[in-house]
Amino acid sequence: MANVLINGMGVLGRRLFRMIWDNELSKSLATDLTVTMINDMIITDLEQMAYLLQYDTVYGRWEGHDVSADVVNKALIVDNKTIKVYSEANVAELSLTEAPVSIDCTGRVTDKILDGYIIAGSHVAIGVANTAGTHGCVVYGINKAVNNRTYTPYGNVIALAQILDIINEGYGVSFALTDEITAYTNNNTLEDSAYLSATKKYQVGRAGAWNIIPVSNNAPKLAGFIVPTLNGKVNGSTRNVGVIAGAVMDCFIQTVHLVESEDAIKAAVKAWVYDHTDWQMEYAEAGYISSDMIGLPRTCFDANTCVRKMNDNFIRVSVIYDPITVAAANAALVGAYTLATP
């Protein structure tokens, strides 16, 4: 059992906490994990942190668990176990010798911050962000961490990397253009309001629940970096829409080799799923939509709707997923695997 520090108890950090605590990934983890420490510079009110962990609009009540705040001793008490809570801006100043895995869910992680976790005593530092930095970016089952500090991406990169890996293995990819439709986030607003943007993309400040809003995203390029041989061959766009969770990733691909049929693509996906364990991607023929994926740690390819062949070398492949849960699962799996790997 390896102790974990979670830095950042926002939506992603709280989802990761619940998943680790409930052993949702226990069958896939190389090393069992347990949360023993939290660091958060934003939620400094421990009673509010406990409340937000217990009640979640998307994922529901955390049934069967008792969560409270020990304000005097600066800790959360979860099922009678103590989780120390810190509010340290410089993670290198933390004492992490008893937390071999640190997972940064702040969305503001950098190479220097990842290095800080190792300086503080952790053996493995994972930063959830759509970047590669100098430490690389890992999607479990597609590429591997090269050292004990690495980034893991959000769900959109994971979903896209899976599509690209499947098609590249079977048919080769000349280029790919992506179109992601995803739920609004905390970057969006309830009402039209001013949005500070150096690039003057003021549309991000429009009401998130009422609009289809294009947003900047480097996910396509990052996914192309993660899948070998595809760096520079992938580009695309992302739009936030008025749903609270869930996403679909459409990928339009020009293949190198001839695609025999849609059934051939379905067979390739099914074979990939079989080889990569069922948590990474689900192959289905059930007519799933995005809300059916909420809370699941895997993406889903539904054969009824997720593939179209336009011509012999041009196809569309889609996956649906819960971006937050998929990102949390990948971070935990990469952390556990890296810790267990000599």
Located regions from the model:
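Glycine-rich adenosine-cofactor-binding loop
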Residues: N3-R18
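Rossmann-like dinucleotide-binding core of oxidoreductases
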Residues: L12, T134-Q203
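C-terminal substrate-binding/catalytic lobe of Rossmann-fold NAD(P)-dependent oxidoreductases
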Residues: R18, D22, S26-L94, S174-F175, ...
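Conserved acidic residues
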Residues: T36, P100, H123
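Hydrophobic alpha-helical hairpins/lids featuring a short glycine-rich hinge
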Residues: E93-G116
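Flexible, glycine/proline-enriched loop segments at strand-loop-helix junctions
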Residues: I103-D104, N147-G155, R206-I213
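Rossmann-fold NAD(P)-binding glycine/threonine-rich loop
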Residues: R108-N148
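Short, charged interaction patches at domain edges and termini
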Residues: L296-N330, V334-A340
